[in-house]
Amino acid sequence: QMSLYLAEFAKALGFQVLLCDPRQEYAQPATPIERTFAMPDDAVQQFAPDAHSAIVALTHDPKLDDLALMEALRSPAYYVGAIGSKANQAKRRARLAEHFELSQAQLARLHGPVGLNIGARTPSEIALSILAEMTAKRHGLSLTASPFQPKVST
């Protein structure tokens, strides 16, 4: 499952990780990753994100993801992301604005579709792309232009 890959990769890079999914049927086998079965909005509040926190919603279930995102976007977390297509992101932003009264400034902080475009196809590749975006943002890098692309003079 992608959330477990992301959690393991993030832990390897020194992130403190909390995996939240209230659905018992998706419980992972025993791992060294801290886990909670709390509702996502409660988990975000209890986590008390600060400017060094990253929060990513990965369930594809708006009833769960939107709750987490509502709290995350109201927090000082440096990175808030959600999996889903551009069309789903547009619907999500509309729901968050309408039902949770989030401002346009708060909604502008939402990364989605989440992750850098590296052509990821598998859950582990998608997790890697998400962590790459989180890491770039953590280091204050602009994701609009790659520092590795040569400048072309005309």
Model-derived features: positions:
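Conserved SAM-binding strand-loop segment of SAM-dependent methyltransferases
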Residues: I33-M39
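Residue-level detector of alpha-helix initiation sites
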Residues: Q1, P62-K63, A87
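Short loop/helix-cap segments at secondary-structure boundaries that form the rim of catalytic
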Residues: Q24-I33
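Glycine-rich adenosine-cofactor-binding loop
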Residues: Q1-D21
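Adenosine-phosphate binding glycine-rich loop
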Residues: I83-T154
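Residues in the short beta-alpha loop(s) of Rossmann-like NAD(P)-binding domains
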Residues: D21-R23, K86
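Short amphipathic alpha-helix with an adjacent loop that forms part of the alpha/beta core around
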Residues: P40-A51
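ADP-ribose/adenylate-binding Rossmann-like module
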Residues: A54, M70-R95
